[in-house]
């Protein structure tokens, strides 16, 4: 059974009536003292910081002066803020789309905060001057406002209208909030037969109301000449069309609980979105589905993306700095010289950005830019040196999945570079200084990505399962030279490349001292670290190696209890919840091998020792192995934890939880040494 469902239907051509009509249980604009009491529900508790009482959206279509239809989107929201942790809800952000001279318009913005003071409801309205606009990129503007007089137990209401001619991109609707429960979430869309949409519904909660009604509307549309100009004001045409009005409601929707090992709530949260599939002029149905071929053509013409790839002169100004950067004549070494010049000298200021916001010359001058700007600059530099290269667009794990079947550019937040040198392809990211040539950060391994190139455009896939991480830990413990001072030992941890990258990044923030202090704290008082270091820390193309020397005190006692896994044991089960609705998404498959060779402490013998064990998970998808043996003088232990894949559906959760629970218990077992008599 799958963990969520995606429904695909053309929504303007069918009717599905499931529930009878039920009115929205909120009277907007009229707040009484009774409204300050939260209605009875099943999704709030003492930890709830705010409750979305009602969130209503509607989209209707209208004729426009561009020869077709646009839409009107209305939203009304009421929220009860319970404590200061939810004050962020008082700031509302609205994204508007713009393309050339055509832009969406925001109107009828109203926002009011209601407080109960001495038994009286006091309303404080937002002033229009408190509405601000920020440009996100060339196609998106963010309008933002903050409601005044917000404090604990305030009720806020806001509403607004968006007018848009971009009928190909009608608003999606999210029924579930990541942080706050919602008592009533409703979306209504009235779609004429002039346009048809594919909609996809995701999430695990069912609709409380799922209703569709046939109707009929007239649309007054201004004629447009072949040149694209509107005709005379009185040259209008009235088009009659059948409609389908859809109403979707979810009731008592819990906040989305973000569990361990889940890439992005966006992939699983309750929502519905739309893609234009066709238009109908009364005689002929015209498929309008966008394609990656068309999207690639547009992006290669876009001066804010990859137009430099098709311009004859390109960015010739790059030849001068390249002459100073590139010294080798070998193409691979040239590519590395360019790559490391960027990683070592440029600062990435945004890791969710695919467009050039200013110019590549500004990026070079200021030595900083977004991930898109830096990797587009890398692509351009490689092309200037006659190295085959192209940008690759993708969606990072935290941004959610994107579709291989059709392009939704808003879901793409990241750009890397594909370079082909000899018979080998390299995927590069020059925005991260601790990342080596030919490697990508873990969050890029999120499935589908698209190469943007006129000659070699294609879908590529970066899957978590393709990352093969091997970690080995070697521990050697011997008696001190005099046989009386205790034990001394060495610990060598050789993580895989991704773990090495993550360690390098954490050391940049906290430093090596903090790292080794944490190792010392985890080891306890009986073990003292005497020396420590990290090999290959400055070599981003290879994994690191952590080396530690230590002494262990053997107290004047008849019994020693020894935990044979010094570091790296699993202290707690990462899957503590008894029930899980969503899949488990590990960053990559794991294969960890811990090996201990230990002399029996002088004057002691082994009294008790853990038993050997081997446990398999899901018919070979993973296994845990605990092998231990002893002689009179020596103990040898080998512990292996292996997971061959990174993704597990919800139906595997219980067995996964039991598997890791067993590992935690087994790795906590001790060896007992008894003094010789």
Predicted stretch roles:
Residues 516-677:
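A carboxyl-terminal module marker
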């Amino acid at each position: 059974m799958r963990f969520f469902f995606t429904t695909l239907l053309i929504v303007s051509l069918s009717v599905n009536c499931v529930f009878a009509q039920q009115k929205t249980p909120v009277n907007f604009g009229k707040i009484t003292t009774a409204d300050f009491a939260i209605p009875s529900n099943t999704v709030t508790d003492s930890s709830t910081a705010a409750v979305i009482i009602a969130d209503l959206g509607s989209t209707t279509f209208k004729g426009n002066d561009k020869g077709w239809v646009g839409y009107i989107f209305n939203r009304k929201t009421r929220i009860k803020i319970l404590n200061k942790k939810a004050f962020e809800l008082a700031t509302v952000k609205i994204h508007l789309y713009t393309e050339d001279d055509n832009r969406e318009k925001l109107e009828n913005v109203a926002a009011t905060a209601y407080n109960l003071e001495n038994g009286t409801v006091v309303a404080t309205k937002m002033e229009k001057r408190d509405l601000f606009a920020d440009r996100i990129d060339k196609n998106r503007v963010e309008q933002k406002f903050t409601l005044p007089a917000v404090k604990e137990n305030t009720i806020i209401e806001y509403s607004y209208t968006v007018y848009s001619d971009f009928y190909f991109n009608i608003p999606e609707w999210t029924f579930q909030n990541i942080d706050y429960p919602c008592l009533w979430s409703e979306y209504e869309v009235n779609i004429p037969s002039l346009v048809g949409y594919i909609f996809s519904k995701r999430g695990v909660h069912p609709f409380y109301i799922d209703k569709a009604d046939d109707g009929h509307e007239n649309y007054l549309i201004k004629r447009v000449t072949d040149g694209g100009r509107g005709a005379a004001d009185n040259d209008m045409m009235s088009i009659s069309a059948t409609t389908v009005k859809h109403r979707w409601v979810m009731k008592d929707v819990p906040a989305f609980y973000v569990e361990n090992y889940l890439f992005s709530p966006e992939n699983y949260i309750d929502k519905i979105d739309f893609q234009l599939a066709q238009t109908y002029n009364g005689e002929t149905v015209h498929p309008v589905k966008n394609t990656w071929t068309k999207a690639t053509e547009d992006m290669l013409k876009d001066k804010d993306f990859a137009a430099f790839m098709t311009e004859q002169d390109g960015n010739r100004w790059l030849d001068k700095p390249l002459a100073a950067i590139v010294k080798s004549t070998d193409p691979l070494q040239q590519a590395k010289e360019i790559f490391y010049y960027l990683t070592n000298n440029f600062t990435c200021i945004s890791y969710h950005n695919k467009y050039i916001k200013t110019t590549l010359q500004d990026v070079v001058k200021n030595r900083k830019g977004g991930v898109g700007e830096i990797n587009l600059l890398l692509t351009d530099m490689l092309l200037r040196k006659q190295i085959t290269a192209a940008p690759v667009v993708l969606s990072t794990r935290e941004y959610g999945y994107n579709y291989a079947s059709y392009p939704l550019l808003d879901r793409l937040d990241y750009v890397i570079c594909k370079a082909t040198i000899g018979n080998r392809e390299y995927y590069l990211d020059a925005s991260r200084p601790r990342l080596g040539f030919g490697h990508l950060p873990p969050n890029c391994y999120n499935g589908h990505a698209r190469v943007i190139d006129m000659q070699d455009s294609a879908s590529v896939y970066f899957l978590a399962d393709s990352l093969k991480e091997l970690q080995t830990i070697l521990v050697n413990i011997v008696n001190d030279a005099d046989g009386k001072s205790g034990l001394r030992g060495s610990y060598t941890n050789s993580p895989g490349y991704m773990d090495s990258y993550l360690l390098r990044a954490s050391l940049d923030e906290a430093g090596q001292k903090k790292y080794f202090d944490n190792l010392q704290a985890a080891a306890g008082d009986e073990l003292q670290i005497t020396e420590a270091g990290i090999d290959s820390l400055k070599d981003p193309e290879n994994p690191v190696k952590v080396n530690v020397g230590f002494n262990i005190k053997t107290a004047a006692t008849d019994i020693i209890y020894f935990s044979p896994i010094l570091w790296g044991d699993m202290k707690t089960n990462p899957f503590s919840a008894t029930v899980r609705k969503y899949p488990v998404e590990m960053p990559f498959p794991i294969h960890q091998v811990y090996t201990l060779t230990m002399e029996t402490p002088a004057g002691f013998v082994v009294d008790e020792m853990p038993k050997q064990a081997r446990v398999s998970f899901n018919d070979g998808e993973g296994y845990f192995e605990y092998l231990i043996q002893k002689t009179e003088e020596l103990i040898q232990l080998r512990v292996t934890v292996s997971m061959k894949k990174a993704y597990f559906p919800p139906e595997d959760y219980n067995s996964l939880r039991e598997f890791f629970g067993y590992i935690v218990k087994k790795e906590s077992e001790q060896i007992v040494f008894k003094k010789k008599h």
